[in-house]
From Swiss-Prot:
Keywords: Chromosome, mRNA processing, mRNA splicing, Nucleus, Spliceosome, Transcription, Transcription regulation. Residues 210-221, 306-317 have a biased composition (Basic residues). InterPro entries: CWC21, mRNA_splic_Cwf21_dom. Plays a role in pre-mRNA splicing as component of the spliceosome. Involved in modulating global transcription, probably acting via interaction with RNA polymerase II. Influences the chromatin distribution and phosphorylation state of RNA polymerase II subunit ama-1. Involved in regulating the germline sex determination pathway. Gene3D superfamilies: 6.10.140.420. GO terms for biological process: mRNA processing; RNA splicing. It comes from Caenorhabditis elegans. This is SRRM2 protein homolog rsr-2. Residues 109-131, 161-425 are annotated as: Disordered. Residues 57-100 form the CWF21 domain. The keyword Metal-binding does not apply. Residues 189-202, 399-425 have a biased composition (Low complexity).
């Protein structure tokens, strides 16, 4: 189904559902729609050349006259005249305006508004009349009438006729050129035989004249170059003489004045790197050094981590605790810690392990009355040092005692539960 045509489903129809055109139906020939045909053009021309209604135009002109009469009446009222005098004068003014309009002295068409269709048509007609008068066309002329009389065959024939005289003119010019060339060739052939001997002599003379001219030109150029060099040398000599005179006239005190001026000049700052500044920078770097790998220290400050970098403002706004860390004592302690060798670390690790083992080796006996008394009186336990054999025996006994204590704890719990039940009864 396509655009509402055909079956919704091909099921049960015995077909594939393909919609095929009815080839037995005869299609009527479609008429071509002629846009901007002759009828349309005539209608458009009629609308453009439509003349305004003169009755409506006269009515609008009279309205403009009444507007002028009302304005005149308002002026008389402002002056304070009577109603009878005002009516009489306004009536006379109206009659004069109507007479001028009929005679053509008064033109009110310019005052009419262009919003009205008749006023616009009137203005368009006036413009067309001006154009017709400028081109010298009569009032009976219809635009396009001259082309309607011409046929296509006439147009083609006129064009061909205009091209024929041009072709004839071209052929005539070509013939005249050919004749002129032939006459030239004949003259050259006749004169060549007579002037062959004279031409050889003239050619040799021409070569001599050319060589003489070149030699003269070279000599003139060399003379000009020598003159310029002499002028430059004279100028140099004059300048040297003037400089010698100035040196002789100058007093000997000028050297002293120059020395005094040099002394008065302010000493310029030496912008080169001083040794003191470099020492200060090295001291700062030593202070900033932190426990890091040497690879991290060798890197440039841009490649280091963010924690490694710290701007100057943050350094200035640090708390006093940070200043304590910067103290030389703390710095030495850090260096000792991180510069210690592996043997010291191992020794400290073994010592810590031994201390832990000794703490575990303290005798763990079951609580008794004496221990309760010690706990109440806050007396510290006594540490007993034993040999390796005694330590193994004590471990075995502690394991046995722990198993026995667990059994005794279970029995004591059962007895305590039975006692509590009897008490409750």
């Amino acid at each position: 189904m396509y655009n509402g045509i055909g079956l919704q489903t091909a099921r049960g129809s015995g077909t594939n559902g393909y919609v095929q055109s009815n080839l037995s139906h005869l299609m009527q020939a479609r008429r071509k729609i002629e846009y901007n045909g002759e009828d349309d053009l005539r209608k458009m021309e009629a609308e453009l050349n439509r003349k305004p209604n003169e009755e409506i135009m006269d009515h609008n002109r009279k309205r403009q006259i009444e507007v002028k009469c009302t304005e005149f009446e308002m002026l008389l009222e402002d002056k304070g005249l009577d109603d009878e005098d005002i009516e009489r004068k306004v009536g006379e003014y109206r009659k004069n305006l109507l007479k001028q309009l009929e005679s053509g002295e008064l033109n009110v068409d310019e005052e009419l508004s262009t919003k009205e269709s008749h006023a616009r048509r009137r203005a368009a007609a006036n413009n067309r009349d001006k154009m017709r008068n400028a081109l010298g066309l009569g009032e009976d002329y219809v635009p396009g009438s001259s082309m309607a009389k011409m046929n296509k065959s006439d147009v083609v024939g006129a064009a061909m006729e205009s091209e024929l005289p041009q072709k004839d003119d071209k052929e005539k010019l070509l013939e005249t050129l050919r004749l002129h060339r032939k006459s030239k060739k004949k003259q050259e052939s006749s004169s060549s035989s007579s002037s062959s001997s004279s031409s050889s002599e003239s050619s040799s003379e021409d070569e001599k004249h050319r060589k003489d001219r070149k030699k003269k030109e070279k000599k003139q150029k060399l003379k000009e170059m020598e003159k310029r060099r002499e002028k430059l040398r004279q100028k140099e000599r004059e300048l040297l003489a003037v400089s010698d005179k100035v040196k002789k006239e100058e007093p000997a005190e000028s050297s002293d004045e120059e020395d005094s001026r040099k002394d008065q000049r302010k000493p310029r700052e030496d912008r080169r790197r001083s040794v003191e500044r470099q020492d200060q920078r090295e001291d700062r770097r030593d202070r900033r050094r932190s426990p890091e790998d040497p690879r991290e220290r060798r890197r440039s400050p841009e490649d280091r981590t963010v924690r490694r970098r710290s701007p100057e403002r943050r350094r200035q706004q640090r708390s006093p605790s940070v200043e304590r860390r910067k103290s030389p004592q703390r710095r030495d302690e850090r260096r000792r810690r991180h510069d210690s060798s592996e043997n010291e670390r191992r020794s400290t690790a073994t010592a810590s392990k031994k201390s832990r083992m000794d703490e575990l080796e303290v005798k763990q006996e079951p609580p008794s009355d004496s221990e309760d008394y010690i706990a109440k009186t806050n007396l510290a336990p006594i540490r007993v040092e034993k040999s390796a054999e005694k330590v193994e025996k004590s471990r075995k006994s502690s394991s046995e005692s722990s198993s026995g204590s667990s059994d005794s704890d279970s029995s004591s719990d059962s007895s305590s539960s039975s006692d509590s039940s009897s008490d409750s009864e």
